């Protein structure tokens, strides 16, 4: 059998053992809890003095401080240059987390290695010291097991009934002398020969502190058992929890304590309540404190400290890849901690809905209580659905949570007025104020799938909330008010109404300030950039008047875009110095992220696809643009006789083509307006990706016109200078629809010949939408569906047959793409673009 196979079999056996043990513990615990009267448990809890609870929670939070001595010994032994206050804070955070998800202390050991490696160059010595701390956590129990064997702590009622427990205590007790001997023979260095002894003593005090918290929990619920007996039961229960490999010993520890106290004649209801208080005081309270400390201890300052550490610099090249992720994780700890606190707050106050209903049932002012219940529930729901927003440091989410806390605070004062909970709300509110001031993101981009998920989650949470309230009241056999005479039957809809009102108010407050950003009245700088660095096929549309401009900080490049529907839709590629494009996009994406806007690029070329890809985008091919090589274009030859026939027909009708330079007279504008109105036939102008018929736009470039023999304009096209690849393009092409003449062909042919005569090398005929898009069976279904929507719901222009029409000019086809974020929906992004194009 190979070594690899042995290790694999050993891992499987460990997993099977842990799983079987866990199932057995759960089954036994379920059997024991099935006989418990939960009504009596709740009644016993309601009779507990609240100040006793506060004292217990303080003891639980303080007990974790003893574990900081591990880190103090470590820092002093290795002579690490860390302020003591920082050591205590980091240690408290590590130990609180380790208590919940410790897996035998490995989580805590990993965090210690992660934090302290930046303060030493001798990583081997650090790992050795941490391993001693890890093992010594068990040695404390070994020392206490010796005291149980010596009957200093009394567990005889368990040992006498279950004989194999005695042998487990003997075996565990033997670990201590072996560990002490090993650490003294193989110390980390000469100066730390007694490190194992010191850590064992710390471990012993820590286990005794935890046992004391359990004893105080039993005292509070009126269990009269001697201190030494409770400690003895605790030690055996702690050993059971360690053997189970379950984080925190959940299940195994509780089962042993339950059976141990039950064998002494203690009612199960009291034991359950004592265990719940112990778990809350020794595990939950320290985690809360650790989360609060994390919001201050980690972040930009800690990140900067690690980056500037003299021990980190030499290893930067070696570990830069891993460290790049580690420092990002450290920076996110404060927001994660605050989001967790908000989540806990939401759950706690959802549970307190039971108290409001209970008080309302016995109060004469039922309506006031149930209105408060709706407000309270709405606020709790807003806390829950904004947890992710708080983690993402969204100001809007933080503002939602702050408003929700104000409502919960008001409802709490009116109803059950718990001083502990009111203090908790104030603490979280202060943390949120600090987070709001640090936040640089106004809101997160809107996502339809996120909205659907939020609605489903909200409905589910409200249903579960109602179910828990009704089942709790039923289980407690509490008097019920008739639903027909109570406002309680409208509770669900009142909650929805309050949520909608709150969301609407906050959305309006934030949204009204950021609707048309970066409007630019003076386009002279844009014109200068185009003349200096060149433009593209769409750069002339800067003069259409329906776009905003995002300018590069050094004014070397810019973007044309439009704000619509919580999105910034950019037209084409950036314009200007290509060397400035990356920094321009970084600034633009930072700006969009700050305000919570989606960023979509429309009709971009494939020149800068790698650049767009770097920003986490994906692509959809919109179609292909027809580019005619004017150096090869001709009307001569057999294949071009159709072109010659068209031109000859216009000559026979004495229809003339002419290029006019601006400025244009009022009379000409009036004639062009008449042609445009008849061509539109009551339809609205399109926007954004094409120009509109406005005098300001027409005055920016030459216009090609076709006149009949009376000199009346019957067709026209507006030129689009590109300052790019010696190319020319046209924008508006309009003619009198009543005339049975191929006027569009005539305009194109005359423009092609004119452009060739003027020395241009390329002519852009525009895009054939969905050309070669979603045509194969292997194409993404969503792309084919989105392409059909984009094609059939764009009513002004007909794209069917457009490629076939342009093919007769023998163009070269260049692809054009839609660029959108990878976490955004394709069809929803295209709908946003359509809104921009179809609405001014």
Swiss-Prot record:
Q: Which family does it belong to?
A: Belongs to the LPG synthase family.
* Listed Pfam families: LPG_synthase_C, LPG_synthase_TM
Point out the gene that encodes the protein: mprF
Q: What name goes with this protein?
A: Phosphatidylglycerol lysyltransferase
- Subcellular localization: Cell membrane
**In which broad location class does this protein mainly occur, judging by the first location in its UniProt entry?**
membrane
Query: Organism, per UniProt?
Result: Staphylococcus haemolyticus (strain JCSC1435)
Q: What is its EC number?
A: 2.3.2.3
Q: Which residues lie on this side of the membrane: Extracellular?
A: 30-52, 111-129, 189-193, 251-271, 357-366, 472-490
Question: Which Gene Ontology molecular function entries are recorded, alphabetically?
Answer: phosphatidylglycerol lysyltransferase activity
